[in-house]
UniProtKB/Swiss-Prot annotation:
Tagged with keyword Cytoplasm: no
Subunit structure: Heterodimer of LeuC and LeuD.
GO MF annotation: an example: 3-isopropylmalate dehydratase activity
Top EC class of this enzyme: lyase
Name of the protein in question: 3-isopropylmalate dehydratase small subunit
Reaction catalysis annotation: (2R,3S)-3-isopropylmalate = (2S)-2-isopropylmalate
Functional summary from the UniProt entry: Catalyzes the isomerization between 2-isopropylmalate and 3-isopropylmalate, via the formation of 2-isopropylmaleate.
Any one Pfam family match given in the protein's UniProt record, by short name: Aconitase_C
Taxonomic placement: Bacteria, Bacillati, Actinomycetota, Rubrobacteria, Rubrobacterales
Length: 195
């Protein structure tokens, strides 16, 4: 996992509340066995509508997704995060997230930022008015800056540490590689070994 320090660029003003993981990535896409290539399935059913915000040329290349309350609710499929990330989003801003989706984002290097509903509304309106506007999510300073918005956000210290250092669950374990190897060398030969 790559470290996340700052996500800066155009934003996609989705704004919908209660977007579930089936809407983020349809179940048809779950037949894939790789973790890559899910971006093309992001909001697939909604993208059939030519007026859907993600289809608009002015929003191409957005790196920050701005959503409504309870983003990522529904099933626990990690594929939803893979689709968001594979499409190019490094951060998602919303008033609230489903817990499992938020946790999956952390484990995959996508920064989730919870801001008050009114702040998210102002940011959505500003980006809808000026699609070229830059939104900056700075994890080091815990700030979000955009047109008419400059605010701080809270994030768990350990989650912040993981993201800043690019540590997924495997990366956290590998920080103890020497201890693991020492333990394996000290185990009796008749015990199962990890290769």
């Amino acid at each position: 996992m790559e470290p996340v320090r700052k996500v800066e660029g155009k934003a996609l003003p989705l704004g919908y509340s209660d977007v579930d993981t089936d809407q983020i990535v349809p179940s048809d896409a779950l037949k894939r066995i790789e973790r890559t290539g899910f971006g093309r399935f992001l909001f697939a059913e909604w993208r059939e509508d030519p007026d859907f915000v993600l289809n608009k040329p002015e929003h191409q290349g957005a790196v920050v997704l701005i959503a409504g309350e309870n983003f990522g609710c529904g099933s626990s499929r990690e594929h939803a995060v893979w689709a968001v990330q594979d499409y190019g989003f490094g951060a998602v801003i919303a008033p609230s997230f489903a817990d499992i989706f938020k946790n999956n984002c952390t484990k995959n290097g996508v920064l989730t930022v919870e801001l008050p509903k009114e702040t998210v509304r102002r940011l959505l309106e500003a980006v809808r008015e000026d699609p070229e506007a830059t939104v900056t999510v700075d994890l080091e300073s815990r700030t979000v800056k955009g047109p008419g918005v400059e605010t701080t956000f809270e994030i768990d210290d350990f989650v912040r540490y993981r993201l800043l250092n690019g540590l997924d669950d495997v990366g956290l374990t590998l920080r103890h590689e020497e201890d693991i190897e020492r333990f394996e060398r000290s185990r009796p030969r008749y015990m199962p070994r990890v290769l």
